[in-house]
Amino acid sequence: METIALNNLTIGYHHNCIAAHLQATLSAGTLTCLLGSNGMGKSTLLNTMSGALPPLGGTVDIAGKSIAAYSAKALAKQMSIVLTRPITVQQLCVNELVALGRYPYTDHWGRLTSHDETIVMESLSLVGMQAFSQRKVGTLSDGERQKVMIAKALAQQTPIILLDEPTAFLDFPSKIDMLKLLKHLAH
């Protein structure tokens, strides 16, 4: 079982500390929710845990190894992340965007195998977006784009998925479906 550990982690931007001395251990097979008021550092913590933002102190470890010691490709096989930032690849088709989650597993040229393409379609199916596979990302609603980004994380097939507001932009029935899917995937 993969675990992610925060060891005396201090997060923030440049020299502006948001939270210090964080300690936590999360195991695979668990669904953990981080709650807090707006502006309290939840997204900063997720960005730091993913390696997108360097810690101001301490470490984030996966399976006992600091994420700083992983190559980008090796880390992408351990952890995927869905953030709340707007998607800037409006001209890609949905299946092309989700296929980006498979690139840690592709060859030097980034070619997808038929197995990769199957995983992309299965991931889209899990979030109810398979019928949208050929649509341009720029034509999707905010909720549809959120589902596509979650499908991309699922296609990455990592033991750890970090989700920043995973039900943002989703209508109420889709929120319920997404939470059921996440619970199922965690167990």
Region annotations inferred by a language model:
Residues G58-S66, L75:
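Conserved ABC transporter NBD signature motif
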